[in-house]
Amino acid sequence: MSTSNDIRFSNDVLVNAERLINRDFNGIYLVLGSHIADLERIEDPTRRQLMSERFIRHFLPKDKVEPYTRKGKEFLARYWEALRMEGCSWLSENGSKYAGQALISGLALAISHLFPAPWNVTGSVLAIIASILIKAGIDVLCDQKQNTPP
């Protein structure tokens, strides 16, 4: 069984996750969905072309993009209540102590126990989810009425 100590975040993963915070939520869900699809080993020849959100949005037909966005949203929705509670708690205690990549990696480690394998040890997926939580903000995460992801 893997623990959060086994998770490694490459500099590229953290840089890209930090950039995602400035994107719209659908763009982040698109990237998350493509990573989830990779982990599920979905056989899709267009997946090899999904290099970045910009490439996806501008060069692939919408019917090739929407399934990945939907997959990202559905994945996050499954875990939203636990993520919201953990994110609220962790950001309340640590949000002012960290910034940028340190904030992303700290929150990613804090939420890793909420997911089954392989997602609980996949740094890129955890960093993307941490970016979504950071972008949503502490007000959204700590709102008891926020039943669905942004």
Indicate residue ranges for each PLM-predicted region.
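Contiguous hydrophobic segments
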Residues: I56, S124, Q146-P149
